[in-house]
Amino acid sequence: MKLFSFEKSVGGVVFRKQGSELFFLLLQYRSYQWDFPKGHIEQGENEEQALRREIWEETKIKDIEVYPVFRSIVRYFYAAKKNEKAERIREGRGIYIFKKVAYYLVLTSQSKVELDFENKDYLWLNFEEAMKKLGNDDSRGVLKAAKNFIGS
């Protein structure tokens, strides 16, 4: 059994403008945690291709503009539990995961979201509300950096 895995993912700080206000998209995952759209980079994809695919799969938002000059990296480690652990063992993947997520800033004009099976809910929130709702400090740091970038 393989114990360790190193995995790369990509995520999007998806935002839209409404007048002079900015609204950021957060998804509620099955774990009940609120976060940005994100997912694995599949074989043969570059980061932008994976980002576009993940945003489409999770939200059905297709009209996006990716800002490649904004790239924020988050690294973390976790141990798979319960169903994920069993699935990883079956697939021969490590149960201790070193994860690297590259986040990009993504502008859209779409406000309608159609959720996939991975997500329970979504919200478009202003910066202050999004900072309160996000489920972890890493994501709050990414949002703060994105807001600073937009403001510059």
Question: Model features per residue range: what roles?
Answer:
Residues 14-16, 28-29, 107-108:
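Residue-level signal for short segments within beta-strands and strand-turn junctions
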